[in-house]
Amino acid sequence: MRVLLSNDDGVHAAGLRALAEAFHGDEVWVVAPDREQSASSHAISLHRPLRLLEVAPRWYAVDGTPTDAVYMGLNLVLRDARPDVVVSGVNHGPNLGNDVLYSGTVAAAMEGALLGVNAVAVSLAAPPPHDFGEAARFAAALARQVVARPPPAPVLLNVNVPPGPVRGYRFTRLGRRTYGNEVVEKTDPRGRKYYWIGGEGRVHNEDIPGSDCNAVLLERLAAVTPLHLDGTHDPMFQELRSWTVPGYEKEPAP
């Protein structure tokens, strides 16, 4: 099996190395950002050149985003030898609920799916110090299932693993998390103000049965959530059929 690995924590991250070890015996290629890129979402570099450095055999660093890394991995490094699966992680911390909208880990996997390759994003929902081995092994086992039982269209599976041995897993839906939404103001030695987004506010996880948040944080199960690349809000789409915009003609739906 040929595997393309990436992440958002950087090419030298411990979680990425654990993932590579979990695919021992497979043909593993790594194309990852050259530095930490957490919460970079699906940003792609269109207005500056990118550099690609082979830091070890089949192990590449890109001076760009996680999306840049997977894009270059599929369209340059492995252009003539498509991988069977793209796996992103192991992320240092969870990507649950609305985290997926900000996550560079999830975005790297999503880029793989957008480019036609089944993909898995994996995160360890634990504070440091991190032991990534169990999360990496679970992700590798799941990735092999994806390759053995390929879906009709490219799939993206978002995996979150609690600390310790995986005693079980559940297929889940995305939960909902409420962030502190703080902006912390500081002053530098020259008297100028600067700001940190987020601060140290607590994150509230809504108690939603069947959600990834409940499975991982309350029941200590690994959560596997299939993410749909079509972001259309279907109930609102149906509602809009009854709307009119004054002064403009509405064309009938095809």
UniProtKB/Swiss-Prot annotation:
Record function comment: Nucleotidase that shows phosphatase activity on nucleoside 5'-monophosphates.
Keyword list (alphabetical) reads:
Cytoplasm, Hydrolase, Metal-binding, Nucleotide-binding
| Xref: InterPro entries | SurE (IPR030048), SurE-like_Pase/nucleotidase (IPR002828), SurE-like_sf (IPR036523)
Key word Metal-binding present: yes
Primary location group:
cytoplasm
Q: Where does a divalent metal cation bind?
A: D8, D9, S38, N91
Question: NCBIfam families recorded for this chain?
Answer: PRK00346.1-4, surE
**Entry EC no(s):** 3.1.3.5
Cellular component terms per the entry's GO annotation: cytoplasm
- Cofactor entry: a divalent metal cation
Q: Does Metal-binding appear among the keywords?
A: yes
Report the sequence similarity comment from the record: Belongs to the SurE nucleotidase family.
Designated name of the protein: 5'-nucleotidase SurE
Report the locations given in the UniProt record. Cytoplasm
**GO molecular function, one example?**
5'-nucleotidase activity
Q: Bound how, and how many: what does the cofactor note say?
A: Binds 1 divalent metal cation per subunit.
For this protein, the record's Pfam families field holds:
SurE (PF01975)
Organism, scientific name: Anaeromyxobacter dehalogenans (strain 2CP-C)
Kindly give the SUPFAM superfamilies that the UniProt entry links to this protein. SurE-like
Which reactions fall under this protein's catalytic activity? a ribonucleoside 5'-phosphate + H2O = a ribonucleoside + phosphate
